[in-house]
């Protein structure tokens, strides 16, 4: 992945907009985020409005470094160890919040999610914006709530857009996102670490770093981004099927005269009826994750009657991809 050189004038303009309560789409290594000043209640509420997101659905505060953690949350030895190892990077830590963190950020909960992104543009923006006051940016994915996340600036422009016709004040174009799916989210607020959302930082990596088992979160865990049953969804109805079932389903729907868009391993293409769009699924979890939202956008743009997606392998390294596909087709 090639990242465009940082445009310092654009960063300065973005800081100016954020300082007065505006909204800026910024690139991260995961997906594009819709940034607002986390200390500015009205700016954060405008983020919810722009996305059509329920205000009880908590946001992640993005910070410039691990040194910002104590300003926003009650840190723990586990949080400090993980931040040393994986920050900047695609790991979000959920901790008990400090009074400084407004309830408009946390969805009314007593916990806050924190992340330090590694994308050069995001890092430059956070350093310029944060300053000695340790300010942070809320930055949910820069798309309409529940829809496909954006992995490039074009996705943001096509969905939310820039004023006056759109909803945002600025889009920073930092190229295509490296990982393409949202960060791993780990709850450290309840005594034992638990995974709220799967991502590039895997369970095995977390367990190795912490020296303990890290299960999936239970029903009593804090509410968190990306945990709704239906999420990341294309507008076209989509189905997730095992390979043989997908072949049979494609033939049945084709016989009914439906126009199909399919994402599956290349080896299945010859076994399918004629389809409007066929996307060859990558064979590695990391490549698939980086490509996933771009592929979903392309499948949706085919204006098919149905999207069919072959289920990925049921192995630990595919957990994040499997999670996103399951929610996108729910």
Residue ranges and their predicted role:
Residues 1-330:
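Active-site-adjacent structural elements in enzyme catalytic cores
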């Amino acid at each position: 992945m090639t990242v465009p050189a940082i445009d310092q004038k654009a960063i300065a303009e973005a800081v100016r907009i954020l300082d007065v309560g505006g909204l800026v789409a910024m690139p991260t290594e995961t997906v594009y985020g819709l940034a607002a000043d986390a200390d500015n209640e009205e700016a954060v509420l405008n983020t919810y409005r722009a996305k059509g997101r329920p205000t009880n659905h908590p946001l992640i505060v993005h910070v410039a470094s691990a040194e910002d953690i104590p300003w926003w949350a009650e840190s723990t030895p586990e949080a400090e160890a993980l931040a040393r190892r994986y920050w900047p990077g695609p790991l979000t830590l959920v901790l008990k919040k400090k009074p400084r963190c407004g309830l408009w950020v946390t969805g009314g909960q007593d916990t806050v999610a924190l992340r330090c992104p590694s994308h050069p543009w995001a890092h430059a923006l956070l350093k310029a914006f944060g300053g000695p006051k340790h300010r942070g940016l809320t930055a949910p994915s820069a798309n309409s709530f529940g829809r496909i996340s954006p992995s490039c600036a074009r996705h943001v422009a096509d969905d939310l857009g820039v004023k006056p016709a759109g909803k945002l004040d600025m889009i920073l174009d930092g190229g295509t996102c490296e990982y393409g799916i949202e960060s791993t989210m780990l709850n450290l607020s309840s005594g034992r670490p638990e995974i709220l959302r799967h991502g590039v930082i895997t369970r095995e990596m977390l367990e190795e770093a912490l020296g303990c088992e890290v299960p999936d979160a239970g029903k009593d865990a804090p509410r968190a981004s990306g945990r709704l049953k239906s999420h990341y969804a294309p507008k076209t109805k989509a189905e997730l099927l095992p390979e043989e079932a997908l072949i049979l389903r494609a033939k049945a729907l084709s016989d009914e005269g439906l126009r199909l868009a399919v994402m599956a391993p290349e080896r299945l293409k010859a076994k399918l009826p004629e389809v409007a769009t066929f996307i060859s699924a990558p064979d590695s979890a990391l490549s698939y994750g980086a490509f996933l939202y771009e592929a979903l956008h392309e499948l949706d743009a085919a204006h098919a009657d149905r999207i069919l997606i072959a289920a990925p392998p049921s192995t630990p390294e595919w957990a994040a991809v499997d999670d996103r596909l399951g929610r996108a087709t729910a």
